[in-house]
Structures are given as C-alpha cells and as structure tokens.
Amino acid sequence: VAHPEIDNGTPFAFEPVFIADEDLRPVIVTVVKATYDFDLQGALQLADEQIPVNLAGEPWSDVPVSSYKYEPEIALCKLATDVVLIGHACPPQAGATRVDVGIKVGPVRKVAAVFGERFWVFTKGGIAKSRTAALERIPLTWENAFGGHDKSRSTPERTVAEPRNPVGTGFGKPLAKDGDHLRLPNIEDPKQLVGQYGAVVPPCGFGFTSPNWQPRASFAGTYDAQWNKSRKPLLPADFDRRFFNAAAPGLIAPGYLQGNEDVVVLNVTSMPRVAFRLPAVSPPRCRVVLRGRQDTELPTNLDTVIVNTDEQQLILLWRAYALAAGGPHDVTTVEVVATS
C-alpha cells in the first residue's frame, strides 16, 4: 500500500488515521496533538517532547477491565470539546478525611467530593458506614467512583453492573453476614452523596468513559433484528455522533473551545489552586491531496483538552476528516500548517 507523503509544518505531533465512517466509507482523519508543560504558578510552555498520537489508548492498570487513562485517539470526529482531568486528589492538610476537587476550563466546570477509605460493614446492629480514614493521594479514576458489578448475581450470560460505571465501587454485593464489607466510593458528587446502603447515585468522575458505558452507549444506535436484516455491517441508522465524545458527564463543552480560555484546578497538586489559560493557538489547517482530484482544505476543531496534574502537562487535540474513497492509496499528500 502506498503511504501518503506527510508534511507537518507545526511544532506539534501529527498523525493521519485511516478508518471508515458510519456507512463504511473510507475516510482520512487528521489528528494534531500539542503537549505543553505548566508549573504550579501557572506558567505554560510548549513541551520539548511532543507526545505522539495514541492510537491504542492506555488503561489505568493492567487488570482485564480497567478505565482509560488515555482513550484511543482515533475518533472520526467529536461534536464538542471533551475536557479530561488526570491526576490525584491532594488534601491541603494532613489528617483531612474529605477534600473538594475541581476543574474549570472556560464554560466547563465540575467539582467532586473526595473521601478517605471507608466501607459499608455488616454488624449485628445492621449495615453501617465505617469511620472515614485520613485522606492520602487518591487517584481520580472511575475505579474510585460509584459503580461496579455484582459478582454474586452475575452469570456468564448476564452481568449485573452499574451501566454508567461498571468498574467502580459501592454497587451491589449483598452484605449478609457478620464481617461482610463493601468499599464505598472515594469520589462523589457533593450534591448527591451516598446516604444509605443500597442507594444508587450518579457516578462522579473526571476521566475518559468507555464506549460501552451509559449514557455514551445510548448513542451507538439500535442493534436489533431490523438492523441485522437490512443494515449490518453498517452502523445503525440511529447512530448518533455524540457517541464519539468520551468525557465524563458535565465535562463536555457546549460546542468547541477556541483557545485562550481560563483553566483552574483545585486540590490536585501540592498547591491547592493552579490557574493558567489555554494557549491562544488558532486551529491548525490540514490539506489533503487526493489522487487525480482537487486538494481538500480541512479546518480542524479543538475537540479534546486533557489536564494531567501528575505530569503537569496540558494536551490539546485538533481533528478533521475527509472522505478518501480509495483509502490510503487515494491520498498522495497530507499537509498540516499552523495558522496565526
């Protein structure tokens, strides 16, 4: 297969990705990825090492089912900007049992209450919460939010799980005998805390969601007998491109961020508050040259903003796509240029 010539005129990482759209038409997706370093005083600079586009994604751990630390960066498009926070809750003083963690990027904001370890415990007097342990650095993962699955009621044919976060904790697992216990979530919505045993609350998180989780999975369309008969292997006619947005509920912007928005993170570093602005960078422009046809100019959209407070990195992704009827063989040149 002939590979297109790549001309990257930006200081950022760039990757052309060849996939298919909903109707199995070959498309080229141009993904531009910028990495910036920031310090705790809010100074931002372009990183010496630009992180490459991550086609496979990266889980938080190597257990068979883990939440994504970084999603695979191969979406066809996103209809709005995803905002993702990667890091740990950091209590401002020793001995604290709760800290409120937050992020704000332009119009997008979210706050969570983060607690030290605690459990539901079965005793002769009933099921009660244990004492809350002093907070240490708590990873802001979906594993530490409300959710999980109930192994006692699951079968090989059917898993009983919290559909919005099957990797979390606090869901299911009946407590029936003395000493039985169930870990409560560390991360909760401060407006909807877990009040009593058996309560079901919205999982609260800051990370990437997985395609099979709700509400994201509801946008994947209807896979029924009619689809099987008349449309398979294409995606269902009611597939909704909102499926491609992978940020947590509350962290999808109303449209695309433009750059220069203010960013504030709370209680996720040794400094309780860190603030800076997104770089005032215009979206890069891509030009795709198709064999025997006119060039296609592709303006990109800033569709993913990742703030990693562990590494003190800001990652921005811009994306665009174009039909390429012959797949990679149809594309002779891909250029990307920075715009002022």
Predicted regions and their residues:
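Extended intrinsically disordered or low-complexity segments
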Residues: H3-S340
